[in-house]
């Protein structure tokens, strides 16, 4: 599956969860077009409510439903980098991971730009 097709499929899934997803960015080998047969899909995820902590996001029922829908729709493994809360968001933006996301990232979903 090519990057464009992957992004469209991911967007369809993400758009079903506007109550929990604020922004989703594809990064890593798929965003660079360097994926191999065993490549996982790397996603950076910000919640729709930026005040919600990372721990609360990960334990929410809706987030678990979102994860299951990803795994049900793809044969690949996922690496979901989910960050919430002001402190965690500020911290991740000072890391090499963030530099990679900025450099290679492909926006999959942004709740603020979705049409209702």
Task: Annotate each PLM feature.
Residues 1-23, 32-37, 47-116:
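Catalytic core of pol beta-like nucleotidyltransferases
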Residues 27-29:
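Glycine-rich beta-strand-to-loop/alpha-helix junction loops that act as flexible
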Residues 42-44:
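Short, well-ordered beta-strand segments
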